[in-house]
C-alpha cells in the first residue's frame, strides 16, 4: 500500500543533526531504505519536515522505519495511507 511518512523534526535536534552532519545522512538512508516513490522537504509549524511516499508491504515494517528517526532525531511521525489519481479513479466507483 502506498504510504506517506510524515517526519517532523524538533528544532533543537534538527539543529544538532545539521551541525554534526547526521541529518542529511539519516534522511538519505531513510529514503533509500524505503525505495521512496518521492520525497519532499518542507517547513511546517516552524519545524523541518519530510514527506516521504513509499510502498509499505507489511505493517511490521513500521518499527524498523520509525525507531531510527525516533532515536536519532526525536522525530514525530505519521504513517498515512495515500492514493494517486489512478487509485482514486479505481476506488470511487466502489463507493457508490
Identify the meaning behind each predicted range.
Residues 1-96:
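Conserved, structured core segments of small domains
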Amino acid at each position: 500500500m502506498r504510504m506517506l511518512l510524515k517526519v517532523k523534526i524538533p528544532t533543537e535536534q534538527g539543529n544538532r543533526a545539521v551541525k554534526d552532519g547526521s541529518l542529511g545522512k539519516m534522511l538519505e538512508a531513510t529514503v533509500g531504505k524505503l525505495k521512496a516513490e518521492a520525497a519532499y522537504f518542507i517547513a511546517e509549524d516552524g519545524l523541518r519536515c519530510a514527506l516521504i511516499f513509499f510502498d509499505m508491504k507489511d505493517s511490521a515494517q513500521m518499527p524498523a522505519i520509525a525507531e531510527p528517526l525516533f532515536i536519532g532525531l526525536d522525530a514525530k511521525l505519521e504513517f498515512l495511507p495515500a492514493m494517486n489519481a489512478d487509485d482514486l479513479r479505481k476506488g470511487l466507483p466502489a463507493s457508490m
